[in-house]
From Swiss-Prot:
Record Pfam families: MinE (PF03776)
InterPro entries: MinE, MinE_sf
tRNA-binding listed as a keyword: no
Keyword flag Iron-sulfur: no
Free-text function comment from the UniProt entry: Prevents the cell division inhibition by proteins MinC and MinD at internal division sites while permitting inhibition at polar sites. This ensures cell division at the proper site by restricting the formation of a division septum at the midpoint of the long axis of the cell.
Annotated S-S bridges: none
Name of the protein this chain belongs to: Cell division topological specificity factor
Membrane-traversing stretches: none
Matching NCBIfam families: minE, PRK00296.1, PRK13989.1
Length: 84
């Protein structure tokens, strides 16, 4: 966020906020090693809240999964969006 946008009170878009949160989570996991992913339920709830602003979905329509294979971590997010 630049100083000008801070002073003018411009709001960040939800996509950029979500991107920042995911970057923080990934950075935290890399520093913390192989700690369990206890943030996944909270991440799933937040994703449902954000997506629900635009499309009607329920908690069952989204799946968040973290898989670890040696030195590789994959965060998988599956979202079922109803047809219009």
């Amino acid at each position: 966020m630049s100083i000008l946008s801070f002073l003018l009170g411009e709001k960040k878009k939800s996509a950029s906020i979500a991107k920042e949160r995911l970057q923080l989570i990934i950075a935290h996991e890399r520093v913390g090693g192989k700690a369990p992913a206890d943030y996944l339920p909270a991440l799933q709830r937040e994703l449902v809240a954000v997506i629900s602003k635009y499309v009607k979905i329920s908690d069952d329509d989204i799946r968040v999964n973290l898989e670890r294979h040696d030195d590789l971590e994959v965060l998988e997010v599956k979202i079922e969006i109803p047809q219009v």
